[in-house]
Amino acid sequence: MLQLANRSVRAKAARASQSARSVSCAAAKRGADVAPLTSALAVTASILLTTGAASASAADLALGAQVFNGNCAACHMGGRNSVMPEKTLDKAALEQYLDGGFKVESIIYQVENGKGAMPAWADRLSEEEIQAVAEYVFKQATDAAWKY
């Protein structure tokens, strides 16, 4: 799913880049300075490529919530941790103890491999489910949406 999102974002960025060239050509024909315009559009395309590709779709988040509720909530209901209460799933806690920092990839690694009392889930969940639950946990933590 994320690969499809990446393709969509790349297509949008390519269209933005093409539009920038068209606008720049038209402005240049009128003798206008096109450097600031071209630069601004390039920055916009870059932002689309870096932020849009990492965002999860509503369907991905719904699957992530379903996987979380069916597999993770026994220990992590509402973002808590019933085994080690200090290691919640809020952003500040995840920033402290995730190997690799607070990012989806670090959550994926921990879900796949486990750590401490947390078991590895790579043999029980599909790659799609792990990706979705990692994006869900990341989004919940980023938005401070866990309900304690």
UniProtKB/Swiss-Prot annotation:
Compartments (UniProt record): Plastid, Chloroplast thylakoid lumen
Residue stretches spanning the membrane: none
A Pfam family that the UniProt record links to this protein: Cytochrome_CBB3
Tagged with keyword Transport: yes
Induction or repression: Induced in copper-deficient medium.
Gene Ontology CC entries for this record: chloroplast thylakoid lumen
Gene Ontology BP term (one): photosynthesis
Subunit structure: Thought to function as a monomer, however 2 crystal forms are observed; a homodimer and homotrimer, suggesting the protein oligomerizes.
The protein's name in its UniProt record: Cytochrome c6, chloroplastic
Organism name: Chlamydomonas reinhardtii
